[in-house]
UniProtKB/Swiss-Prot annotation:
Name of the protein in its database record: DNA mismatch repair protein MutL
Entry's family note: Belongs to the DNA mismatch repair MutL/HexB family.
CDD domains in the cross-refs: HATPase_MutL-MLH-PMS-like, MutL_Trans_MutL
Low complexity composition bias: residue spans: 371-382
Gene Ontology terms for molecular function: ATP binding; ATP hydrolysis activity; ATP-dependent DNA damage sensor activity; mismatched DNA binding
HAMAP family membership: DNA_mis_repair
SUPFAM superfamilies associated with the record: ATPase domain of HSP90 chaperone/DNA topoisomerase II/histidine kinase, DNA mismatch repair protein MutL, Ribosomal protein S5 domain 2-like
Chain's gene name: mutL
Organism: Bordetella bronchiseptica (strain ATCC BAA-588 / NCTC 13252 / RB50) (Alcaligenes bronchisepticus)
Signal sequence, renumbered to the chain: none
Keyword DNA-binding applies: no
Alphabetically ordered keywords of this record: DNA damage, DNA repair
Cited function: This protein is involved in the repair of mismatches in DNA. It is required for dam-dependent methyl-directed DNA mismatch repair. May act as a 'molecular matchmaker', a protein that promotes the formation of a stable complex between two or more DNA-binding proteins in an ATP-dependent manner without itself being part of a final effector complex.
GO cellular component: mismatch repair complex
GO annotation, biological process: mismatch repair
Length: 629
């Protein structure tokens, strides 16, 4: 056994290097900390110059308030800051930085120089991070922080850096995240004295377009809602524009980029019915909440936050985004005022350039019931009548009682009358105009699978089974949502061993569990008894179901597991209760299905996230046949 070493105070330099290990991972970490300081200083224009991907040099110049010469040494002292003075200020902090560790940590692992000039000062002053000597310098009002030779003093850290190109890419990512959060600030980025990025001051919508591109904005839906002290705004992609990777997901809480599992879970819940396979949504969302209701001091790099009431945040985000995605079928087919020759992106997105600036407008109050947020980007489109004849096959009854939801998936009748699809004389189908139904009028059926329809833009092709599946699925969900969740009492309670924290969760969330159809009670210090469960799920594994619900409650303060399992059952029922392939439909039945799609939420995708229809404009068809070329 080795001799015991006495306890000793660590040198200040080593303390700063240890702190740097938590905060400074790579050049992008340095850039993030300096940019946040510039934002806190009130900068309206920031210039960044990099060399070697930020490994050899990071120089950030801003036009903020500057630092007086007598405070420059304090700026490089650990735990010295102008942001907070008390615990109360920490608990409601609104600035990006507040710990006073960043500059001291950077100076301990790199060569650092600060040149700063306050407004009204005769000249600038500079300080060297090594000697801490302050001397006169030249420079405009504002601050320049110059960092060179990152990790030269800590070779063990430097060997973990990647190539210069990779590190430069991370620096660009860090700058984009901050630029998206602060559209009022102008940014310029240079690498080896070559201009790489430039973003002028703009509103949120224009900044998103500038940073992420017109293609991204061309496939998004605007989000804007508020309820009490919480508000959400931004953009979410349509389900059809989901990505293979989760690489374009930007969440800001009070202007700070974070990764939060509560909001991530809420967004997955909102997209649950409309994403195909393992596709990932893209979004830029700004969540504003009372600073006292969120703790930002939970992660060394401030990448995570903790909400005081995570369940309320989850419900708000999930319902707002869910309502945004729940547009009726065909909303993208005929946007108002889009000429036939319009670019596909413009026609698809409903003029995103006009919708994006609306993100900067003041938020309207959002009722507690969370109706559809804001106005649709298609608000100029004529209202669609909601008095259509429901889609029915021959022999199907004319109506379904609202309480008889089981009849929605009754077995289909026998062969329906075949549609007249052969080439023969038939009445000419008038060309629909833009003020008629977005999905147009049915023309024929193809291979017993697809419906061909004509609208004012061109040709619409509908997968009739996928479309009818979504219609039936939404009817089933509405029928169950309108009634209390039935509960089934167990003859013999299911008792299982549980951790003490799970027993505490049962007591804490008793009301919420009852609303979900559960009756759970602690049956001892380390066991839980389940006495009743939702009737729809009574035949499942009760213990596994209860544990999964408690796991959700412990993680995000809310559980959508029962809703997801219920919807999975309804999806299967809808699939088996929908019109099958090779079933011949009449034109009247085809048109009835199109009309129901137009008044059904999420009808652009089936229950499994596959598209239910596609649109070809006349221009698209002309290109196939080389017309006009």
């Amino acid at each position: 056994m080795s001799d015991r070493r006495p306890i000793a105070t660590l040198p200040d330099l080593l303390i700063s290097q240890i702190a740097a290990g938590e905060v400074i991972e790579r050049p992008a970490s340095v850039l993030k900390e300096i940019l946040e300081n510039a934002i806190d200083a009130g900068a309206r224009a920031i210039e960044v110059r990099l060399e070697g991907g930020g490994i050899r040099r990071i120089a950030v110049t801003d036009d903020g308030s500057g630092i007086p010469p007598e405070e420059l040494p304090l700026a490089l002292t650990r735990h010295a800051t102008s942001k907070i003075r008390s615990l109360d200020e920490l608990e409601s902090v609104a600035s990006m930085g507040f710990r006073g560790e960043a500059l001291a940590s950077i100076a301990s692992v790199a060569d650092l120089t600060i040149i700063s000039r306050t407004r009204g000062a005769e000249h600038a002053w500079q300080i060297d991070g090594g000697s801490l000597q302050v001397s006169p310098a030249s420079g405009p009002p504002g601050t320049t922080i110059d960092v060179r030779q990152l990790f030269d003093r800590v070779p063990a850290r430097r060997k973990f850096l990647r190539s210069e190109a990779t590190e430069f890419g991370h620096c660009v990512d860090a700058m984009e995240r901050i630029a998206l959060a602060h559209p009022e600030v102008a940014f310029r980025l240079f690498h080896h004295d070559r201009a790489q990025r430039q973003w002028l001051p703009a509103d949120h919508g224009q900044r998103i377009r500038d940073v992420l591109g017109a293609e991204f904005v061309g496939h998004v839906l605007p989000v804007q809602a508020a309820a009490g002290a919480i508000a959400l705004m931004g953009m979410v992609t349509r389900p059809t524009a989901a990505r293979a990777r989760a690489d374009r997901q930007y969440l800001y809480v009070n202007g700070r980029f974070v990764r939060d599992r509560t909001v991530s879970h809420a967004l997955r819940s909102a997209y649950a019915d409309v994403l195909h396979g393992d596709r990932q949504p893209a979004y830029v969302l700004y969540l504003d909440i009372d600073p006292g209701a969120v703790d930002v001091n939970v992660h060394p790099a401030k990448h995570e936050v903790r909400f005081r009431d995570s369940g309320a945040v989850h419900r708000f985000v999930s319902q707002v985004v869910g309502q945004t995605l729940a547009q009726t079928g065909g909303a993208e087919a005929v946007p108002a005022g889009v000429p036939d020759g319009a670019a596909p992106d413009a026609a698809y997105a409903g003029e995103p350039a006009a919708a994006a600036p609306g993100l900067a407008e003041p938020r309207a109050p959002y009722p507690a019931a969370y109706p559809s947020p804001g106005q649709s980007p298609y608000q100029g489109s004529p209202a669609r009548p909601h008095t259509q004849v429901p889609f029915r096959l021959h022999g199907e009854p004319a109506g379904i009682p609202a309480t008889d939801w089981q009849s929605l998936y009754r077995p289909l009748p026998g062969d329906a009358a075949p549609a007249a699809t052969a080439l023969r004389a038939a009445p000419a189908t008038p060309l629909p105009t833009a003020d008629e139904h977005p999905l147009g009028q049915a023309l024929a059926q193809l291979h017993g699978i697809y419906i061909l329809a004509q609208n004012s833009r061109g040709l619409v092709l509908v997968d009739m089974h996928a479309a009818h599946e979504r219609v039936v699925y939404e009817q089933l969900k509405r029928a169950l949502d309108d009634r209390a969740l039935p509960r089934q009492d167990l003859l013999v309670p299911v008792v299982f061993h549980a951790a003490e924290k799970d027993v505490a969760l049962v007591e804490e969330h008793e009301t919420q569990l009852n609303e979900l159809g559960f009756e759970m009670r602690p049956s001892g210090p380390a066991s839980i008894a389940v006495r009743s469960v939702p009737a729809l799920l009574a035949r499942g594994d009760i213990e596994s179901l209860a544990r999964a619900v408690l796991r959700d409650l412990g993680a995000v303060g809310v559980s959508r597991l029962l809703t997801e399992q219920r919807n999975e059952l309804l999806s299967t029922m809808a699939c088996h209760g929908s019109v099958r392939a090779n079933r011949r439909l009449t034109l009247e039945e085809m048109n009835a299905l199109l009309r129901q799609m137009e008044i059904t939420e999420r009808a652009d995708q089936c229950n499994h996230g596959r598209p239910t229809w596609v649109q070809w404009s006349v221009n698209d068809l002309d290109k196939l046949f080389l017309r006009g070329q």
